[in-house]
């Protein structure tokens, strides 16, 4: 029993995170120097994401009997994303108004260092609905894969899958080649995941070493509020959705515990994307549903980021004594319904979207971003974890609604997790 525990990725990542925290706390300088380990692991994961998505989506769509089923899956997914993301935004808005973590800080926006957030504000200027939609269309296929833009690769994969499906028997050779190629990529993922403990150690040691546990004290109230809100959202909202669909949210969380620990160490839900594709398929979801819902969810279904955006925006208003009546907050909510769709599941994207939102709303000081710049890194873990669980639940919900879920397999995997395929 013990050897299997020590060999499990779950234990190794958990131990690596703990060691990283200790190193960063007791030797901050050395801990901060561990950053390349975390960055290197995330880059290795990103290296494989584009081809994995392409192969999964193409083989899933091309292998379906009806193209109408693909369109229905996409429509159901987008409706679900919009409804649940809106609920997340509203919950964040309600909690921050009730607890008021920024009240009493009395910060003068003129005293804040606007230069510290200038980079984010500049990137935020490029955010917009039209710009976002145009960015989904790649300048070239090679460019989409080279940049690792998930939505661009997804668009090309969908078109490729449709075209391959229309070829009928003539496309069998190409279909078999791509399907076989996907197994090679998942084999590469298995090799990369052996380095997950190293990546988690480096990222956590850097975070604690650079920012220190002490930096959490002053603005700790916002962090605590945010973590509690994310926890409540997962347990109550996603838990209720899971119950309606027919599974237990806690058993599902236990099923993806290794992916959650990887995300905890890297602060990016994108780092677990390749494994989630395989695990959701192993859970009983058809490949076509998994290939569409999860990659799309990384831009349209970021529940943790949605909660963060409303809480952070109102927190800045409270801290700087910027008045926000009910109409201002409704305006904020409407703006976030659009701007939040431009956030990808990578570290720091939520902060850029927040800068874009403050600029769009107008009456909130963009310089107020400096207040949470130092603690944003500590909130990214909760964002990423909530995003990952949210996308997993979304996949099961959509698969259930479109009749592409093997419920018997779902129950078997969640109840008897020991039967989980080891190749994932």
From Swiss-Prot:
It is a multi-pass membrane protein. One of its GO terms (cellular component) is plasma membrane. It is found in: Cell inner membrane. Keywords: Cell inner membrane, Cell membrane, Membrane, Symport, Transmembrane, Transmembrane helix, Transport. One of its GO terms (molecular function) is malate:proton symporter activity. The keyword ATP-binding does not apply. SUPFAM superfamilies: Proton glutamate symport protein. GO terms for biological process: L-aspartate transmembrane transport. The chain crosses the membrane at residues 4-24, 44-64, 76-96, 142-162, 184-206, 222-242, 326-346, 352-372. PROSITE patterns: NA_DICARBOXYL_SYMP_1, NA_DICARBOXYL_SYMP_2. The keyword Transmembrane helix applies. Pfam families: SDF. InterPro entries: C4_dicarb_transport, Na-dicarboxylate_symporter, Na-dicarboxylate_symporter_CS, Na:dicarbo_symporter_sf. Responsible for the transport of dicarboxylates such as succinate, fumarate, and malate from the periplasm across the membrane. Belongs to the dicarboxylate/amino acid:cation symporter (DAACS) (TC 2.A.23) family. NCBIfam families: PRK01663.1, PRK13027.1. This is C4-dicarboxylate transport protein. It comes from Erwinia tasmaniensis (strain DSM 17950 / CFBP 7177 / CIP 109463 / NCPPB 4357 / Et1/99). The gene is dctA.
